[in-house]
Amino acid sequence: MMGAMQIDRRGLLAGSVASAAALAAPAVAAPLAAQGLDAAQFGVRPGAPDDQTTKLQRAIDRATRARAPLWLAPGVYRAGDLKLGAGAQLIGVRGATRLVLTRGPSLLSAQGGEAITLSGLTLEGGDIPLPQESGLVHLLAVKAVRIADCTLTSANGNAVKLDQCDGDVSRNTMTGAADNALLCVDSRGLVIAGNSIRNSGNGGIRVWQSAKRHDGTIVADNTIEDTAARSGGSGQYGNAINVFRAADVIVRNNVIRRAAFTAVRGNAAGNIQILGNHCFALQETAVYSEFDFEGAVIADNVIDTAENGIAVTNFNDGGRLSTVTGNLVRNVGVRRPDNPPEGAGVGIGVEAETAVTGNVIEVAPNAGIRAGWGPYLRNVTIAGNVVRDAGYGIAVSVVNGAGDASISGNVIAGARLGAIVGMEWHKAVTGDLLKDGAARYPQLTIANNRAR
């Protein structure tokens, strides 16, 4: 056994010389590092005061051709309008590798290709104006995008814009975007998860389609705070999460605080699911499913402090077909100065083909639950809910042309203006239907409710 392991001194010396020669090989001929190619091999220097766009672009192109990640050491790199080819991977040290925009419509962009990865980078916009159709990172028609563990700050426009992309945007921090933190247009099946978004000028996460069609994006486990509406409007801006024309989108388990308008707004968004979100301090309705949509599941959300809680609306434009189940809504009635006071303070409002079941609503100075708006009421059931401390417990439209509603098994406490009251738009036109008068409205079924 010892013979097999006997060491030859001459062989050992020869091996040592060979190892030393390998260590002394010039940098330009260095093999791939464990984490990929080092950008320093191409003359890219962290902390250099000059613009390093040309050197960085050369390094990106070489690494992409080699199908290897490009590694950027800790430090500041000043550059702009860097182009990413198919398979490009830029890897930095989280919180320490900083790319600062100097020029161009974007800091990093790509058109076409697939498998583009950005990881561990801090990308700074430096408040340099960006075109509306671009972003600090702008990817067009890229498959299998991955943006992870990055920080994006001071984008004077959109922080990230994804057009016609699919892939994953996860665990990033986006702060101070003048327009949107993340704008996705005509993309499919994105996973947007675990991001922290703060101080966006017009929107947190926007999932849009240019025409109504399948999207399938999942927006989950994000924290979105302090969303403004710098461009004004009546709800086009100022939403933490906005889904527009995009069908089959799931918005779940997000924590949303302080938005100029809405926590989650689905506009013409068919088959949207809004599940388990925590929504606090909204200046308009906390959760909206509105305009020309068919299909919405709104369940298990916690809403505290908003103008209104949940609105499933615009039957006049085709908005219909939803379930509103298991939500906790409290402390509504905080009114935007530019909105009429009579529209504030509703816990849950619905119009057509909707089941409202198992919700708890507390402190709703207008109405705990409102069913219908003028003639826009059809096939609504309101069952097994608890309403406490409201103006009207349940307000139901009884104008000519309003359709059917079933109101059963609800518990209503402290409804100052009546437990169940018939309405013509904002105006009450009946007494408390729980006590008397319900027989005049055969389209209403009112049974087994309790009030005190």
Residue spans for each PLM region:
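Surface-exposed loop/turn motifs in large extracellular/passenger domains
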Residues: 109-119, 137-148, 165-168, 188-191, ...
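Acidic Gly/Asp/Thr-rich repetitive segments characteristic of extracellular carbohydrate-active
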Residues: 39-71
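C-terminal segment of N-terminal export signals and the immediately downstream linker at the start
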Residues: 26-41
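N-terminal secretory signal peptides and thylakoid transit peptides that target proteins
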Residues: 2-20
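Core solenoid repeat modules with strong leucine/isoleucine-rich periodicity
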Residues: 229, 252, 268, 273-282, ...
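Extracellular beta-strand-rich solenoid/capping regions of secreted or surface-exposed proteins
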Residues: 57-65, 77-91, 98-144, 159-165, ...
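Extracellular beta-strand/beta-solenoid scaffold signature
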Residues: 101-109, 129-139, 154-164, 176-187, ...
